[in-house]
A protein has these predicted regions:
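Generic detection of short hydrophobic beta-strand segments and adjacent strand-loop junctions
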Residues: 48, 131-135
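Short catalytic-loop micro-motif centered on adjacent basic/acidic residues
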Residues: 23, 56-57
Length: 135
């Protein structure tokens, strides 16, 4: 793990934003995580309607591009299990992965994602757009 990896320090920051967070359970989360966080984090998936688009958000260790959830034509599957950033249109859906802020893979920088004005942007910590896709 990176030297800066400090999940306990992130807890107060996340709790301060609890009304703005939709979270899903990852493959390493446990009930103790739910005990310290003030918003739900144990759901396997979350379906969001943003700007008229349906996002199926999941961690990705169960549902992913190799084991698709019940998507409709044009839906967006977003997951982060692999820690590898992706933003690509598939035949019947769009696949998004914001990468990882703490343990990025495949030589990528630490990244996060923003969805704004119909554009999914993956950014590094300096705010540079690393990858984007218009949805």
């Amino acid at each position: 793990l990176p030297r800066e990896y400090a999940p306990k320090e992130v807890i107060p920051m996340l709790n301060d934003m609890k009304k703005e967070i939709y979270a899903v359970r990852g493959n390493c989360e446990a009930e103790v995580d739910q005990m310290v966080l003030q918003f739900p984090v144990m759901a396997d998936y979350c379906i969001l309607n943003l700007d008229g688009r349906t996002f199926y958000a999941t961690h990705g260790h169960v549902y992913n591009e190799n084991n698709l959830p019940p998507l409709q034509e044009g839906d967006i599957l977003i997951h982060g299990h692999t820690h590898v950033l992706r933003a690509e249109k598939k035949e019947s859906y769009t696949l998004l992965n914001p990468g990882s802020v703490s343990i990025p893979k495949e030589g990528n920088p630490p990244t996060y994602a923003i969805f704004e004005n119909g554009i999914f942007m993956i950014k590094d910590f300096d705010g540079n757009i690393v990858k984007s896709i218009h949805l």
